[in-house]
Amino acid sequence: MLGLPLRIYLATLLLPTLASAAEPTRHLCFSRSDAIWLANLDGTGARKVVTGVDPAISPDGVRVAYTEPGKGTVRHIAVMELASGNKTVFEKLPSDNAYGPVWSPDCQRLLFRIYIGDHWRLGLTGTDGSAFQFVGEGSPANQDFQSPAWATDGKSIYAQDLTNIYQLDLTGKVLAQWKISDAFSDADLNSNDRIEPTEDGKSLLFDADLDADGPIKAWEGPPPAIFLFDISSGKSRRISPPKVYAWGPCWLNAQEYLFTSTVDGRHFGVYKLSLTGKSPQLVVSNASSVTVSAR
């Protein structure tokens, strides 16, 4: 029979192992060429999982939602179970042109853009494509909604229409509204920009186009940068370093975020940076459009 001191010693040796075993395994999901890839949080162990674009790994890390391109303008939302490889393609939506799925925090619904009657609208559906509904109609400015994102409580969403930023309930009712020109003093939004709320719901992570020329000659258009928008004040501040082209942000944790960047306008990679950091760290080369599981 083991003595008490020896048993205590062995227990202390086991504690770190047990704690590590209890920690969730988080993953990165990103685009590479015409396919969607999965990797460990540090970028190692990358593997191709499916052909498609606009990857969004579910918060629980069990499934990935994405856009499956077809011929011409045909695009469908699809969901794949990562363990089995089984996938469901949403072919019964009211349009054959839908893209950019975003998971609800509880992993039960998907939000995306869908083309109806010459306008992009926001669609909401279950993870099997059932129970489809529109989120309102056009924006109050009579423009198309862009950049949909879930609020952290799953009861409302954020979007923008190139004129204003909105918080909407799931019927499309406007809960809050901010002018983009007031929120960004030296930048503007485009239809492909991403919104990422903080876990505490007090701020939004944005990418936006700077009102300035950039140093990369091979880059067409204004240089992109990452901003943190404070909901209470309605103002934003740039957090990505000067001269760094940064877009497509997502939260890694409360103090760090991931984003896509390039140094030459031709080759892309996923980088990591803290909110106050100045030197981005490469996580995955030849990658873009990153999302990360929460657990």
PLM-predicted stretches and their roles:
Residues P5-T17:
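Bacterial N-terminal signal peptides
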Residues A21-R295:
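Sequence signature of WD/YWTD-type beta-propeller architectures
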